[in-house]
């Protein structure tokens, strides 16, 4: 039987993978992907704890995070597309060009 610890371990591993991606990558698009992995890891943790405590608060938080992540993707992807059209690069080091 899969217990709460298994879900929390998977959640923690996914969060660490996302955090490593945030710290190691220089591509803006990969930073967005890493952020989504981290948010999904948090969702797994919330839903697992919610299931084992028979409380719906964790599932409500997970739905809230999913809606926030969807808006982040919509706005962020639009900004990334505009950034690529203007500078022909998705490198995070080229963000210094935005300084006024």
Curated annotation (Swiss-Prot):
Cell membrane recorded as keyword: yes
Presence of the UniProt keyword Transmembrane in the record: yes
Name of encoding gene: nuoK
EC id: 7.1.1.-
Transmembrane segments: 1-21, 28-48, 64-84
Subunit description: NDH-1 is composed of 14 different subunits. Subunits NuoA, H, J, K, L, M, N constitute the membrane sector of the complex.
GO molecular function: NADH:ubiquinone reductase (non-electrogenic) activity; quinone binding
Principal location class: membrane
Domain of life of the organism encoding this protein: Bacteria
Name used for this protein in its record: NADH-quinone oxidoreductase subunit K
Biological source species: Helicobacter pylori (strain ATCC 700392 / 26695)
GO biological process: ATP synthesis coupled electron transport
